[in-house]
Amino acid sequence: MVGTAAPRASRAGTILAFDFGARRIGVAVGESAIGLAHPLATIAGEQNEPRFAAIESLIDEWHPALLIVGLPLHADGTAHALTARARRFAKQLEGRFGLTAELVDERFTTHAATAALSDAGVKARSHKGVRDQVAAQLILQTYFDQREAD
């Protein structure tokens, strides 16, 4: 069942996080024992089957205990144009891979990812390839930080 933005009981193991977008999906990986997220991959394209094939490869490689999906919301917390699509994506992940997918508020992660890349000296034209990965990293780090605070 797709979880809400509030973290559930602690889960041990590897976690994959997704920054869902219409054209790209950023992916990050982290280990719950240490609570640290790392950018992993960007899945480009708009067709579902190649996207899910790439996700299946990552799941086969990393054997996650849990999946996290960023939930896009407006600054005031209301639904965004992609909110329903992100929820559907989380349900599709659960149905295809038999893993729990929890939703985490992703407000401002893309802006924060862009700022982090600029601060690291990455040229703006290079952001597109890694920005979504870094946004997924920030989503997963938010999950870890919320879990630790509870």
Positions of the model-derived regions?
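Phosphate- and other anionic-substrate recognition elements at nucleic-acid/protein interfaces
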Residues: 1-18, 22-150
